[in-house]
Amino acid sequence: MNVYLPNGYADMKKIMSLPYPLIFVIGGRGTGKTYGACKELLALPENEKFFFLRRTQDEADAISYYDFSPFQPVIEDNPDEYKPIVVEKVPHVKNISGVWHGKLNDDGVMVADGDALGYIGALSTIHKIRGFNMQSVTIGVYDEFIPEKHVSAFRGGASGEGQALLNCIETIGRNRELKGKKPFKMECL
């Protein structure tokens, strides 16, 4: 199966439509994996939300600022296809940010409008909020899941990080299949 577009970028629409609950996408830097995934996440139906995961809380906090958000270039490159968005902390939930459609208020400031499109969090801190309900979250993207050599590993090394990822998937996915629902999907880029 060809998973590349004619322009050489990864065909994330095709990859993310595969029927597997856990997909690992490994490729060179700058091949459109994150960009393409963000396009697909912003195009989810209204009743479906996403969870965008980074390894550490520092990384999640950085991309929770619009100018550093991986969603920003998608919005700016495709203004006719996507509405403006707002990325900010979720009120009353520590360490989780949200992505909303944005609208200008009376003061000309872009503010969140309606329900969140999805959420941003960190693998290193998701265990602190276990037991929450995320039934509306249908897909997760774990961006930059392969650490660079100079990035310190989780306590417990790679096996600790692997266990944290499995716990994250279980926390968000719960028992959907037992209820006859589609499983939560996780795409690791």
Task: Say what each PLM segment does.
Residues 2-189:
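Phosphate/NTP-binding elements of NTP-utilizing enzymes
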